[in-house]
Amino acid sequence: MATPGLGVLLAFGLPMLPSGWSLTAPDPFTNSTTQPPGDESNGGLSSGAIVAITVVFSILGVLLIAVGLFLLMRKLREKRQTEGTYRPSSEEQVGARAPPPPNLKLPPEERLI
């Protein structure tokens, strides 16, 4: 099943493809030889474009790793809170060491009717 993002990518990406990538059949009566790439050829990407693409994908990769680490840390903290051992004896010992509060009033005496 295709995701909705794939449709958007195809809708906007296909018109941007170079015309040289079209699926039309070549004309058999024309010369289809190409010149070897040289300094004057404009067919490849410039070094500035390559640097820009590298920088963009590097930033996206770093952001993806940062988001992944953030989600991993959040999941580990959640797991640490929900899983563990319960030791009531240690809580009882801590409560026994605390002195009783001063001026503790007794509850009212219950009487029979």
Curated annotation (Swiss-Prot):
Membrane topology (Cytoplasmic): 71-113
Major location category of this protein: membrane
Location of motif PDZ-binding in this chain is 110-113
UniProtKB keywords: Cell junction, Cell membrane, Glycoprotein, Membrane, Signal, Tight junction, Transmembrane, Transmembrane helix
Q: A GO CC term?
A: bicellular tight junction
Biased composition regions of type Polar residues, renumbered to the chain: 83-92
What GO biological process terms are annotated to this protein in UniProt? cell-cell junction organization; establishment of epithelial cell apical/basal polarity; positive regulation of cell junction assembly; protein localization to plasma membrane
Topology versus the membrane: Single-pass type I membrane protein
Membrane-traversing stretches:
50-70
Q: Is Transmembrane helix a UniProt keyword of this protein?
A: yes
Q: Which residues lie on this side of the membrane: Extracellular?
A: 25-49
Q: Which GO terms describe its molecular function?
A: SH3 domain binding
- Renumbered to this chain, region (Interaction with EPB41L5) spans 77-113
According to its UniProt record, where is this protein located? Answer: Apical cell membrane; Cell junction, Tight junction
The positions making up the signal sequence are: 1-24
On assembly, the entry states: Component of a complex composed of CRB3, PALS1 and PATJ. Interacts (via C-terminus) with PALS1 (via PDZ domain). Interacts with PARD6A. Interacts (via intracellular domain) with EPB41L5. Interacts with WDR83.
Q: What function is annotated for this protein?
A: Involved in the establishment of cell polarity in mammalian epithelial cells. Regulates the morphogenesis of tight junctions. Involved in promoting phosphorylation and cytoplasmic retention of transcriptional coactivators YAP1 and WWTR1/TAZ which leads to suppression of TGFB1-dependent transcription of target genes such as CCN2/CTGF, SERPINE1/PAI1, SNAI1/SNAIL1 and SMAD7.
Q: What is known of its domains?
A: The PDZ-binding motif is involved in the interactions with PARD6A and PALS1.
Can you name this protein?
Protein crumbs homolog 3
